[in-house]
A protein has these predicted regions:
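Intrinsically disordered, low-complexity segments enriched in Ser/Pro/Gly/Ala and basic residues
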Residues: 6, 20-21
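Polybasic, low-complexity binding patches
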Residues: 36-47, 55-100
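Short recognition patches in nucleic-acid-associated and regulatory proteins
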Residues: 23-37
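Residues that flank catalytic or metal-binding motifs in active/ligand-binding sites
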Residues: 12, 25, 45-46
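Short Cys/His-rich local motifs and their 1-3 flanking residues in nucleic-acid-associated proteins
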Residues: 21, 52-55
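Charged, amphipathic alpha-helical interaction segments
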Residues: 21-24, 82
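Short cysteine-rich clusters marking metal-coordination/redox-active sites
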Residues: 16-19, 50
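Short, charged surface segments at domain edges that flank catalytic/cofactor-binding sites
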Residues: 1-15, 38-42
């Protein structure tokens, strides 16, 4: 059985958060060798994105606009974290750096 991913930002994991497209990949907002992917899953920092907007996807189009989207998602997640889970220092401890 596939892992059931969830998001603090949407209940609809089957449509792109930004465009509404039904063709999506699940984006872990924080992902790295330090285990941030699992931490993203635990905190609900996963979001459905169209494949060309998914920073880790094979069809990602590297543009300034798309890189800004990735940065904005990281900022949204950090803001949510600070409002619901812990302080900015706690966030840095868990995810390596601040995006705000």
């Amino acid at each position: 059985m596939a892992k059931r991913l969830w998001s603090v930002f949407t209940d609809d994991m089957d449509h792109c958060y930004l465009t509404g497209s039904s063709v999506v990949e699940r984006h872990h907002i924080f992902e790295s060798r330090q285990g941030f992917k699992k931490k993203s899953e635990a905190r609900g920092f996963v979001i459905p994105l169209r494949p060309d907007l998914h920073p880790n996807g094979a069809r990602f189009v590297r543009s300034m606009e798309n890189l800004q989207i990735d940065r904005k998602l990281k900022q949204m997640a950090q803001t949510y974290y600070e409002e619901n889970y812990g302080s900015r220092d706690d966030f840095r401890q868990e995810f390596g750096k601040s995006y705000l």
